[in-house]
Amino acid sequence: MLKHFQRLGGALFAPVLLFPFAGLVVALTIILKNPDFVGELANTNGTFYKMITVIEEGGWTVFRQLPLIFAIGLPIGLAKKAHPRACLAVLATYLTYNYFISAILTFWGPSFGVDFTQNVGGVSGLTTIAGIKTLDTSIVGAIVISGITIYIHNKFFDTKLPDFLGTFQGTTLVSAIAFVVMIPCAYITCLVWPKIQMGISSLQALMVTSGTFGVWLYTFLERILIPTGLHHFIYGPFIFGPAVVDTGIQVAWAENLLNFANSTQPLKELFPQGGFALHGNSKIFGCIGIALAMYKTARPEKKKIVSGLLIPAALTAALVGITEPLEFTFLFIAPFLFVVHAVLAATMAAVMYAFGVVKYGSGIIEIAALNWLPLMKNHSGVMFTQLAIGVVFIGIHYLVFKFLIEKYNVKTSGREDEEEETKLYTKADWKAKNGEGKETNSSDLYSGKAKAFLEAFGGKDNIEQVNNCATRLRISVKDEKKVGPDIQFKAAGAHGVVRNGKAFQVIVGLSVPQVRESFENLMEQN
């Protein structure tokens, strides 16, 4: 069961990867329409303003079509075959599902307690998806319907029909079966979802009123579950789903950013839900403090080597919010340090929230575009509060990690036993053995890693499923006994390996999509 949840979590990350760029576009266009930044260029009748508005509308695509994008994105990670056709089947099925709901509620809305004559939005519980007026099931409905369609696709796509029915094979058969299945799904949704919406409204009120403790607990769970890959199920419903605000924190913040920027009311009063989007601060301030502690405690003769490892990892965490390359340098050798990290991250978020900081998350690039620049005029105090608390926690992380590393003689980078270091330095020999020594360009590098990982997993015949998230290659194998030791993966360039029975996660880094593609190409070639 855990393996299936991990696969789903990884698959959910494909749509999430679209948000950073879209968020930056929206934020920058809002800034460029603000007269405080561009003066007379912000005249609504001017050509500049109109051109910026055109660009802004394009930036809203991802946010306005969120359920549709999640529905289509899920097959990328969960379909076992013919991924493009699975995406097509999901698109058709999800639209069919919403058309069914629209028709049912048009005729029998009052029977389900739904006034379908209302305008969409607000407290109506209604929305439009690809122009279809329907119940607002948010990303929950999209994920469920996409999951059902993917199951049908995996089970029936290769089904052989009699020759005279050959035209109905493949995607056509999948869509036909899904079409029939969507009728009861739509009926059940009309029957159950309005009641769930009432429950969600109560949950939203409860979470918002949970205050500082709620923020602490949310942030702790989001961090502590990273090694399992299940952290997506913590932040997903808050950031992209209806846990605390109907449209999700990410969309709600972007939609109201201009109003927040022009208001002098405290941000915590304007958007208290933003407390559940502070987990990114540990990626900036916490990771910097941890990196400094690891550098300080490294052997003098190893500091130069360690700095080459830690600087890029810390910068990646601080700038774009990808923390695995740093966190996995100490997670496997000292798991208790990761627990400490999660506690400190949660405490930092709670302290920031208590002092009025909200929705300052992810990495510096996103924070600069979505917080610092647009809010500087009326909310500069919040920015300085965030920075002050963050700097304090850099010091706290540094002191705590330095103390624990030295007290318990944790073998972090630069402190390994000599014989362990010798093993690590066999990387060049190991790569030469596998024919990687001649590789010079990035494409060859990805292929080299993929080849090494495939051999470490025991070859093509031992691979059951392949998936990935932002930084991890997720592999299910038939026989875990055929999988090589962690050092074999690290020698090929991995930051670490998570093992859970037949389910493995290889920490690759931001190049994981390219490595996965090369991995799958090698499997097909073999």
From Swiss-Prot:
Return the EC number.
Answer: 2.7.1.-
Bilayer-spanning residue ranges: 12-32, 59-79, 88-108, 132-152, 173-193, 200-220, 224-244, 274-294, 305-325, 330-350, 355-375, 381-401
GO annotations under biological process? phosphoenolpyruvate-dependent sugar phosphotransferase system
Is-annotated flag, keyword Protein transport?
no
Q: Which Pfam families match?
A: PTS_EIIB (PF00367), PTS_EIIC (PF02378)
**Could you state one GO cellular component term attached to this entry?**
plasma membrane
Where in the cell is the protein located? Cell membrane
Catalytic residues (UniProt): C469 (phosphocysteine intermediate)
Recorded hits in InterPro entries, A to Z, give: Glu_permease_IIB, PTrfase_EIIB_Cys, PTS_EIIC, PTS_EIIC_1, PTS_Glucose_EIICBA, PTS_IIB_1, PTS_IIBC_a_glc
Keyword annotations for this protein, in alphabetical order, are: Cell membrane, Kinase, Membrane, Phosphotransferase system, Sugar transport, Transferase, Transmembrane, Transmembrane helix, Transport
Report domain PTS EIIC type-1 positions.
1-417
Superkingdom of source: Bacteria
How this chain sits in the membrane, per its record, is: Multi-pass membrane protein
Q: Where would I find the PTS EIIB type-1 domain in this sequence?
A: 447-526
Any GO molecular function: protein-N(PI)-phosphohistidine-sugar phosphotransferase activity
Please explain the role this protein plays, according to its UniProt record.
Answer: The phosphoenolpyruvate-dependent sugar phosphotransferase system (sugar PTS), a major carbohydrate active -transport system, catalyzes the phosphorylation of incoming sugar substrates concomitantly with their translocation across the cell membrane. This system is involved in alpha-glucoside transport.
Q: What is this protein called?
A: PTS system alpha-glucoside-specific EIICB component
Q: Per UniProt, what is the name of the gene that codes for the protein in this document?
A: malB
